[in-house]
């Protein structure tokens, strides 16, 4: 039994007040600097909505509470957790327009605009979507309106006040870290509209901190090689889609080789890029052990992306000799396998042979390789062209479980 159940209302109000004050004190929308404090508040608030514990509490609006918790996680860079917290909710569940707009942004637009019953909310959501697709002034206009409403203290009720206060912070975060802003700043010469339109279908409005860090490190500007180390599930796959799109936009005649040293990974990539290609207008083919090695030259000529294990590509290399100079980008996935006694030799040998061809750029990906700078230098890149992030989309807890004996 929770010690504060007899004063549950007071404790909950204290949590809301604490959240409000932390956000208000945070300058320049740098909410990540207050992560530890805000996570504690979010975890305490989540207790009020958990199925196991919510029966202990009465008088708490659990729907709104979920939104507040999701907002905190969104602001500190845990968008995946925020989306999970809101799963099963509907934009029309919320009683104020600011709360509905918070839901729309934090969930990545996880609703059909035509399903939004409140016309003002629908209009605001359309303004945000229009900004994402065109880069117009809609976001600035909407942000100015919300800030002015908050400053002039014009609210319908207490819920409207609190939700507007949260929306101010959500809009500030969104304005700073949305896809359109980050991509245009990193590469203003590329038309990102189709890529952003595809991202909207995946309910993605912004990059994860690890992805944004890689872009700011030069992912979209490197000349020869860029190496990226980030934990599993931190967004490496989305990074490859981004770079493939940029490469084909910059050079429509380019070909891209995606080296996946595991057959299971090759099969997974084959299915994924078949779907991605339909959205981004490129074709892909895959060759790997267990699949056919006979690829019609016309089909290969048509394909913009070739997915292969290093071993399979080396078998086909002689028949692909004329095609080799067409590859302008090579993506090296699971790069830590270069150190594998079984697969590393073939992987390293193939990369050594490809390095002799001028004009090829390399994106090297790994979750755990320790000497990422040295690998990037070996590929011909600079030591600075490296993205190294320890960000994970959700915290990981490690524990030892023992039975009958003491591990210590």
List each model region and its residues:
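N-terminal helicase ATP-binding lobe
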Residues: 1-408
């Amino acid at each position: 039994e929770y010690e504060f159940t007899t004063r549950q209302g007071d404790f909950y109000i204290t949590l809301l007040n604490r959240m409000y004050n932390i956000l208000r004190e945070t300058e320049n929308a740098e909410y990540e600097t207050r992560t530890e404090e805000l996570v504690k508040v979010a975890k305490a608030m989540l207790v009020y909505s958990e199925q196991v514990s919510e029966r202990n509490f009465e008088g708490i609006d659990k729907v709104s509470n979920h939104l507040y918790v999701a907002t905190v996680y969104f602001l500190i860079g845990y968008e995946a957790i925020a989306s999970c917290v809101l799963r099963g909710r509907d934009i029309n569940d919320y009683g104020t327009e600011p709360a509905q707009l918070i839901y729309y942004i934090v969930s990545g637009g996880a609703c059909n605009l035509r399903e939004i019953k409140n016309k003002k909310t629908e209009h605001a959501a359309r303004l945000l979507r229009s900004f994402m697709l065109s880069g117009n002034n809609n976001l600035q206009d909407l942000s100015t309106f919300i800030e002015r409403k908050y400053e002039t203290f014009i609210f319908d009720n207490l819920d409207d006040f609190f939700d507007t206060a949260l929306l101010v912070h959500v809009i500030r975060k969104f304005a700073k870290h949305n896809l359109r802003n980050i991509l245009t700043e990193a590469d203003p010469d590329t038309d990102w509209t189709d890529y952003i339109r595809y991202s909207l279908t995946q309910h993605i409005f912004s990059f994860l901190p690890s992805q944004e860090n890689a872009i700011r490190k030069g992912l979209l500007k490197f000349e020869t090689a860029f190496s990226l180390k980030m934990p599993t599930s931190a967004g490496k796959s989305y990074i490859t889609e981004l770079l493939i799109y940029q490469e084909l936009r910059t050079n429509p005649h380019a070909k891209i080789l995606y080296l996946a040293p595991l057959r299971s990974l090759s099969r997974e990539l084959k299915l994924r890029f078949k779907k991605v290609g339909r959205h981004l207008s490129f074709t892909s083919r895959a060759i790997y052990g267990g699949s056919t090695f006979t690829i019609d030259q016309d089909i290969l000529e048509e394909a913009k992306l070739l997915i292969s294990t290093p071993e399979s590509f080396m078998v086909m290399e002689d028949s692909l000799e004329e095609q080799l100079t067409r590859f302008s980008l090579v993506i090296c996935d699971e790069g830590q396998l270069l150190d594998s006694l079984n697969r590393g030799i073939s992987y390293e040998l193939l990369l050594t042979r490809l390095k002799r061809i001028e004009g090829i750029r390399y994106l090297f990906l790994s979750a755990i390789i320790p000497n990422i700078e040295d690998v990037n230098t070996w590929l011909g890149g600079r030591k600075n062209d490296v993205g190294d992030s320890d960000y994970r989309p959700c915290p990981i807890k490690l524990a030892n479980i023992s039975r009958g004996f003491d591990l210590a």
